[in-house]
Each structure stands twice: as C-alpha cells, then as structure tokens.
Amino acid sequence: MSNDLDIFELTDRAKRAQRALATSTTAQRNGILLAISRALVDHCEQILHANAQDCQCAEERGMAAGLVDRLRLDEARIRAISSAVLDVIALEDPVGTVIRGGRTDDGLRVTQLRVPMGVIGMIYEARPNVTVDASILCLKAGNAVILRGGSAAQDTNETLVAVIREAIDSLGFSADLVQTVDPWGRDGARAMMRARGGIDVLIPRGGEGLIRTVVEESTVPVIETGTGNCHVYVDSGADVDAAVRIIINAKTQRVGVCNAAETLLVHRDMVPSFLPQALAELTRAGVRIHADTAVRECAAHVGNLDQSLISEATEDDWRTEYLSMDLAVKVVDSIEEAVEHIRRYSSGHTEAICTASISAANYFRSNIDSAAIAVNASTRFTDGGQLGLGAEIGISTQKLHARGPMGLAELTTSQWVIEGDGAVRK
C-alpha cells in the first residue's frame, strides 16, 4: 500500500459522514440526489472532456470495442444518467420500513426494521455510469461509499466524484459520503480489501478476474456480482420470429454488458426453420459465430452468409464471457441436454428459453439455478431499471444477502427493536 494512503482515515471520515446521513429524512436524501442530477448536466462539458481523454488512451492501448463502448460517454448518455437519478428519487425509501413485527407472549413489541449498511466499498472496472449509480443508490439508502473504478476511466471517474461531492456539500452534508481511492490505483483497491471494520461490505463489479481477486483476497465481507456467461435456448416448437428477435437483441443491443447473451443453444428440431435465419441476421450484424459441427454444417448451406465469421467452437468458447461481437452456438437433442450444458458452463447470471410449451418453461426454470430466468424474453432484461428497481449497484450471483439485481433494499440491513414496559426475561 502506498505510504500516502491511510484507508482507515478515509473510512473514519466516511463513518462520521454516514452517521449524519442515517438520521436524515427521505426528503433530505432525495434533495442530495436532485442536486447530483442537476450537477451532472451542468458539468456535462467538463465530464465529456475527461472522458474523451480516457477513451483516446483506451483505444491507443487496443482496448476491445465493446469495452470502449462501456467506457464512452456522450451528452445523451450523461442526460440518461441524470434522468436515472431522478428515477431513484421516485423510488420508495427502504430506510425505516418494517420487515416484520408483532407482540410476543411476554407482551414485548418486536419490530424488524431496514437500516443502512454503513460504509460500502465498490471496486469496479471502466464503467463511469457505475460511479454515479453506486453513489446515488448508497446515498438514498443512507450509506457512505468509497469507490475504486478501473484505471481506464480514472479521469472520468475523478471528475464525476468531484461533481458529486460538490453537489453533496452544497446542501450542507459532508462530501466524505462519497470518496475515491482511484489516485492510489491498485494499492487503493488492495487497501479497501483489507479495511475490515472500516468498510462494512465490499461489492466488486466487473470481469471474472477482478471478482475472483476480491472474493479470494478480501477480509471485508463481499457481495459477489458474477460474470455474465448468459445462455439463450431455443426449444422445439418455439416461435421462430420471436426467437430470432430475442437472440439478436440479447447478443447485439449492447455487447459489453453482463446480461448480453454469450451462448445460443438450439434444439435439433429447430435447425431447419430457425438456425439459418438466426445465423444470417447475426452475421449481418457482424457477430462472429463459434459453432459446433451441426451449426457449421447448417451455415455452409446458408446463402449470402459471410463464412469468414464462422469458426469451430472450442471447449473454452462455452466458458467465455466474450463482451464482444462473438457468440458460441451449439445444437442440442433435447431440453435436458440444454439444461445440462447450462449447468456445466453458466456463471449463474441469466438464462433464457424461447418456447411454446408451459411444461418446458417450467422444467427450464426449475432445473437451472441462476439468478434470473427469462421465458420468451431477452437476457437484457436482467437490469434494475428494467425490473422496476431503478438503477442497480450490481447483479449478485451469490445466494447470501442478495441475489439478482441489487437495488435500494439490498443496500440495507436490518435492526431489531424490542420494546417493553420494564420487561425482564424469566
């Protein structure tokens, strides 16, 4: 760790700031978010200037196009981020809500309430929107947050954090509610992972390597957000046009995100009707197909298909989260084979089935243990905003505390309040 960084100095400041926020009203916290939303638009030019520098450096280093897309901001994206802050303002405040309660035989009034976590740490890759999402969700739920974004987005993140801190300070709250260790690079990330007692929970968001490092090395409790090796399975008898729309959307709408499809499984019955059309449209969109033998044989007979985009799939392809215009495609003989393939290779994020059969949909749902199952819908819907949670801080693929898109409620813990009239235990 750098001698210039004392992580517990940052966490102590965060804790002091969070104690004041924890006693604030919903209106006050919404006021902070409104100030942030406005500040993002007001400082748009400054943010874009910093982002342009990051994007130029990323391209010069040969970063993949999909990852550069995740990094890049423009005025429309900044306005969309600002608008998403307003959406979070409109969400119900979880702090203080009653989870359950009642009276005991001893006459005690017992209530379990939602309360803030405290200080949350976020370690994530080069996605500037996460800087804003993490900040506003933590603040709305009464938490402070310490951020470590990817080095490829350092100028953008530092500018965003400065804008957010200024907005918080303008309303009389401590700017230390949002801090960053980005100036210390990887030393900052390692310090966060060792800040047990200072950071209450650590949330990594990024690729498999980043998440594994945090999970294995952190002494701070971790909520694991998994990688997105997402599957789409096209069942026998599925609506061909709908299935084609779904795989095109799931793969190509935005390739550098964790809910993009990475593997397409096709029931053998659907090879004549579905697969040629799907391959034609996927390759027309520029998708490189990593195909098993049956898929390659089908592709060879599809007219006007760019055969240079078809290659033989390897074992690694079934395990890969591409985050690019690549898709692994396999023909299966049954839904059972599709389920077994997904069980073996899935990261536990999102799996989709295209089917006309209720029993097949139920079998798929019951036999796959992923955080989200989509039936006749794109994998791209596994998103906090799409599911009515507002902005999300990540998508958890673990089972403890939170699973799936993590919204406001998942950024709280609980407190038991026991009220009596001089009661003592017998």
Model-derived regions: residue spans:
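N-terminal Rossmann-like NAD(P)+-binding subdomain of aldehyde/semialdehyde dehydrogenases
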Residues: 1-110, 137
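C-terminal core of ALDH-fold dehydrogenases
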Residues: 31, 335-425
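Flexible, glycine/charged-enriched surface loops at secondary-structure junctions
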Residues: 26-30, 95, 171-178, 253-260, ...
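ALDH superfamily catalytic-core signature
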Residues: 5, 125-129, 133-144, 159, ...
